[in-house]
């Protein structure tokens, strides 16, 4: 028989294990483990009577949890076992209506099902119910598909089916696979998930995968990296010819999918997640004013390549005095934050680029008051006259307000009216975009949001924008910003894939077929002398407000941030509680950055009576920085 002569129902394909996933140091993160599986594939000539007999035979031989057997399934089993009896439940009038096509055969079947009584079903014992469940599994989905009857079969069950394939008429065994996570829950959310044999292609992804040649019962990546790199990770199916004696002839061998190597350092990732868990719980248990604080975010990058070395977010839920920590890493991609003063490096760039400030420009740090609005001040009072570097070192809001008014060409006097053109907002946003703030990073994950772009052009909002109190950005955008600043204005695309290896069935990895090179996606259009000035400001921060934020890492540079934020306290979709959020961005060593760090702690303070703010953000940042330096060294 040539392949062209073989009927479709004589050929079938089996799922092949997916490619493995490794970290940057070739530590195996995700592997496949063999699972003994019993399945059923109906032959065209098999009658319903034979199927029922097979179901009872298998009920005697395999241990199967049938608790998922629905009442409808049991009624269907009763119907096929008692056709004559159930047929009598249909009246002559109903049969006449069917002949007249006033009702359908489907309506008749529904009437039959409705009229099967609980008393009739009560005659079924445990074995009957088990057989009913097996019969249901045998007939679930399309008749020509393989139906999984049992996974994780015992050695005895596996051997029995294997030895009695001929008489079991459609039942067979195979070694299926499941994903095995060698580091437990560490980074597991972002590694993603794969559909099961039972679920096959999820409904919402059906059109996409069917258009790519998949079958409905194929196992596919359904989230994050498993979904993003489905085309690489999926294996090539083995194809078999079903012989008359129920044996198989191999037409084409299957092969495991491509192994992929990630940019993540799993040992660093593990440490970051542990530090987050410890510090978040400690803050909730022991720090005042943390009513609405429930977690923090961390991202570590290599600024010269865009490689993500670690990324984690944890969320704590307090229930009856018990602290339960959950993974919240997707929030790094989808939950915008109010950044606060960490944007001031980008804000200084606007001032330099437009020529309204220069190296050494001094301004008095004082409250700014626009008519009919509250005074806007720096967090620290009495800073006096500051130049551009000290304005960053001491996080002067007034310096940014006055710079913004100059950018807008506005005439300001205390408590007077202030008018600014819409173009001033766009001047800021254009420069912020060069750093990656306000645009998707296009990181290689399937979900990402933009953040919020304010729609009002009131003059006070321009001043807010200059200190990070207007537009909001996702944590990955903020990571892109500090990475760009650390890389001297070169913006590299953030990414998680490092290498792709050739498909193989061996334990040993195949040769590298693709190396992911750093992708330069933009540059900050600013003279080098001004870039150097901002870097000097960031270095000065670490000797003042940011002291200790990067632990004992040598030659750090960074920027602290405090933001006025809001929280939805009752889950009604409206933000109703004013809070304070904390942020820190940095890199080290400043003269040759090996890593950049982003740490964000939204809603870290809430109080109407106390100014106390939990040090959780600085504690996380300090511990993580030390750990990064220790591991990278």
Which ranges hold each PLM region?
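A generic structural signal for short coil/turn motifs at secondary-structure boundaries
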Residues: 46-49, 284, 606-611
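Solvent-exposed, polar/charged alpha-helical surfaces in well-ordered, non-transmembrane soluble domains
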Residues: 49-60, 159, 163, 188, ...
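A short acidic/glycine-rich loop-to-helix N-cap element
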Residues: 603-621
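Short, solvent-exposed cationic patches
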Residues: 45-66, 275, 325-343
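Membrane-proximal periplasmic segments of bacterial cell-envelope enzymes
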Residues: 1-227, 231-247, 252, 296-297, ...
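Beta-lactam-recognizing serine transpeptidase/beta-lactamase-like catalytic domain environment
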Residues: 28-31, 238-253, 264, 290-340, ...
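Conserved, well-ordered alpha-helix/loop/beta-strand core segments that scaffold catalytic motifs
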Residues: 146, 245-291, 296
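Short, gly/Ser/Thr-rich active-site loops of penicillin-recognizing serine hydrolases
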Residues: 507, 615-633
């Amino acid at each position: 028989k040539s392949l062209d002569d073989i009927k479709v129902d004589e050929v079938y394909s089996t799922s092949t294990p997916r490619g493995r996933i490794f970290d940057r140091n070739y530590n195996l993160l995700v592997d496949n483990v063999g699972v003994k599986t019993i399945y059923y594939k109906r032959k065209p000539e098999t009658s319903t009577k034979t199927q029922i007999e097979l179901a009872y035979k298998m009920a005697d031989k395999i241990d199967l949890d049938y608790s998922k057997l629905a009442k409808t399934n049991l009624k269907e089993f009763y119907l096929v076992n008692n056709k004559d009896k159930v047929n009598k439940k249909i009246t002559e009038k109903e049969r006449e209506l069917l002949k007249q096509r006033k009702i359908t055969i489907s309506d008749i079947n529904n009437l039959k099902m409705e009229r099967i009584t609980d008393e009739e079903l009560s005659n079924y014992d445990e074995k009957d119910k088990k057989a009913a469940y097996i019969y249901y599994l045998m007939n679930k989905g399309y008749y020509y598909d393989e139906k999984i009857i049992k996974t994780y079969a015992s050695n005895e069950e596996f051997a029995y089916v294997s030895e009695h394939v001929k008489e079991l008429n459609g039942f067979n065994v195979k070694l299926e696979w499941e994903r095995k996570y060698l580091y437990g829950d560490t980074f597991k959310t972002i590694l993603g998930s794969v559909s099961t044999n039972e679920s096959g292609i999820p409904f919402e992804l059906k059109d996409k995968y069917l258009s790519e040649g998949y079958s409905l019962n194929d196992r596919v990546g359904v989230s994050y990296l498993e979904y993003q790199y489905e085309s690489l990770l999926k294996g090539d199916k083995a194809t078999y010819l079903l012989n008359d004696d129920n044996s198989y002839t191999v037409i084409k061998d299957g092969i495991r999918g491509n192994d992929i190597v990630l940019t993540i350092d799993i040992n660093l990732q593990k440490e970051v997640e542990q530090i987050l868990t410890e510090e978040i719980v400690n803050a909730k248990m022991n720090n005042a004013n943390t009513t609405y604080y429930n977690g923090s975010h961390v991202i570590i990058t290599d600024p010269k390549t865009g490689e993500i070395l670690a990324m984690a977010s944890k969320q704590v839920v307090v229930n009856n005095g018990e602290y339960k920590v959950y993974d919240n890493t997707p929030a790094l991609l989808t939950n915008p934050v109010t950044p606060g003063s960490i944007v001031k490096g980008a804000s200084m760039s606007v001032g330099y680029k437009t020529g309204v400030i220069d190296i050494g420009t001094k301004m008095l740090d004082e409250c700014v008051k626009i008519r009919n609005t509250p005074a806007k001040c720096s967090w620290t009072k009495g800073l006096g006259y500051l130049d551009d570097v000290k304005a960053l070192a001491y996080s002067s809001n007034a310096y940014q307000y006055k710079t913004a008014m100059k950018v807008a060409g506005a005439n300001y006097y205390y408590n007077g009216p202030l008018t600014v053109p819409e173009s001033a907002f766009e001047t800021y946003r254009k420069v912020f975009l060069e750093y990656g703030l306000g645009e998707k990073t296009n990181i290689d994950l399937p979900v990402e949001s933009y953040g919020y772009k304010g729609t009002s052009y009131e003059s006070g909002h321009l001043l807010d924008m200059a200190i990070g109190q207007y537009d909001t950005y996702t944590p990955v955008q903020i990571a892109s910003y500090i990475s760009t600043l650390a890389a001297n204005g070169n913006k590299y695309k953030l990414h998680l894939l490092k290498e792709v290896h050739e498909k193989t069935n061996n334990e040993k990895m195949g040769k590298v077929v693709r190396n992911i090179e750093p992708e330069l996606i933009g540059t900050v259009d600013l003279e080098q002398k001004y870039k150097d000035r901002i870097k000097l400001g960031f270095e000065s921060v670490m000797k003042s407000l940011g002291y200790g934020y990067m632990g004992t890492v040598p030659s750090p540079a960074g920027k602290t941030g405090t933001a006025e934020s809001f929280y939805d306290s009752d889950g009604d979709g409206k933000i109703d509680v004013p809070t304070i959020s904390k942020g820190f961005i940095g890199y080290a060593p400043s003269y040759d950055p090996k890593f950049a760090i982003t740490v964000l702690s939204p809603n870290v303070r809430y109080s109407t009576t106390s100014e106390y703010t939990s040090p959780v953000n600085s504690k996380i940042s300090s511990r993580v920085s030390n750990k990064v330096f220790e591991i990278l060294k």
